[in-house]
Amino acid sequence: MPKEKPHVNIVFIGHVDHGKSTTIGRLLYDTGNIPETIIKKFEEMGEKGKSFKFAWVMDRLKEERERGITIDVAHTKFETPHRYITIIDAPGHRDFVKNMITGASQADAAVLVVAATDGVMPQTKEHAFLARTLGIKHIIVTINKMDMVNYDQKVFEKVKAQVEKLLKTLGYKDFPVIPTSAWNGDNVVKKSDKMPWYNGPTLIEALDQIPEPEKPIDKPLRIPIQDVYSIKGVGTVPVGRVETGKLKVGDVVIFEPASTIFHKPIQGEVKSIEMHHEPLQEALPGDNIGFNVRGVSKNDIKRGDVAGHTDKPPTVVRTKDTFKAQIIVLNHPTAITVGYSPVLHAHTAQIPVRFEQILAKVDPRTGNIVEENPQFIKTGDSAIVVLRPMKPVVLEPVKEIPQLGRFAIRDMGMTIAAGMVISIQKGE
């Protein structure tokens, strides 16, 4: 049985209007993966005799977007010779950041789209910082709209130098920089004949070489719970995605913060594991599973709890504890000061938190302190802060278990900040 191709999740980032949607559209169009709904519309319009034009497809995708329907994520799967690629999101989406952090899919790589006409813009930087904060290890850069600068190598080299400077200061190494015109199809899927001076990969070739994501099986078991079912004749069945470690039938698992809240261990033996309605003996990172636990009732656990082994239980931050975090403020109408109390979204948990201290403003590129104990922080700032949860929650330092160390901060229906847990301070 040949080994299945690795699945890789990618996100598209970059400044508004630099061509993210067009690039996604071109990838789907040239690989024959345009959403069914659009092909149907084309047929309904009786356009049979006319060629199925890229511009027309982009207009339909734009209409769907404006009606609030982004290209349905389910459609944006395509294959390269060595990879199954899923485009999990693109930042036109209001909940882009929250989805990237709490979504079922952590991105393995990001495609940063930069327009040759503009070069590096504020959002280019912000999205690059964000990719770094979210722990995205691999970046592919496209310098897009090359048709608008007459496919000029000098312009390409100039913008490429700007982007390289930005990404290298963020710690990215060895990333391809590809001159493209998504609108005309140059170097997205098909090699361009307009830029003989470029001999690197096309975008699809670069996507085909994204390193296979490693499965963190050696880390302690962590399964954030999405739902809990009570199934007749079986018992309590929590459902969630294994983030780290492995779960075997017969293991004893404990749930947190449930055990902390009820002041007694909520734990039991795993009697069975199921994935896609098939029984499993062992579940690994990335597996979405249901598992039956002896002696745990449906009322003991809920979404946001995390299952782990009893010898290395999930870390609970209680209301008397605090945690130190590095955050990047993405969108706040005024300024954040001590006492601000928004909602923290981490893995499947959502809990109110309070800003206890703002320790420092930092340079997001180097991590160096720019200002100690600032009075406030605002949109665009990176900072080291101390937060206190208003309800117990499982969080892990990002250096130990990154999957449970990243979070979004939301308020007023929008994502205010993204961050990562540096350390946890236990209160007495």
Curated annotation (Swiss-Prot):
The organism of origin for this protein: Pyrococcus horikoshii (strain ATCC 700860 / DSM 12428 / JCM 9974 / NBRC 100139 / OT-3)
Start and end residues of each stretch annotated as G3: 89-92
Record region (G4): 144-147
PANTHER family noted in UniProt: TRANSLATION FACTOR
Family matches, as SUPFAM superfamilies: EF-Tu/eEF-1alpha/eIF2-gamma C-terminal domain (SSF50465), P-loop containing nucleoside triphosphate hydrolases (SSF52540), Translation proteins (SSF50447)
Annotated region (G5), positions in chain: 181-183
Gene name for this UniProt entry: tuf
Annotated positions binding GTP: 14-21, 89-93, 144-147
Assigned EC number: 3.6.5.3
Entry protein name: Elongation factor 1-alpha
Entry superkingdom: Archaea
Cross-referenced Pfam families: GTP-eEF1A_C (PF22594), GTP_EFTU (PF00009), GTP_EFTU_D2 (PF03144)
Annotated region (G2), positions in chain: 68-72
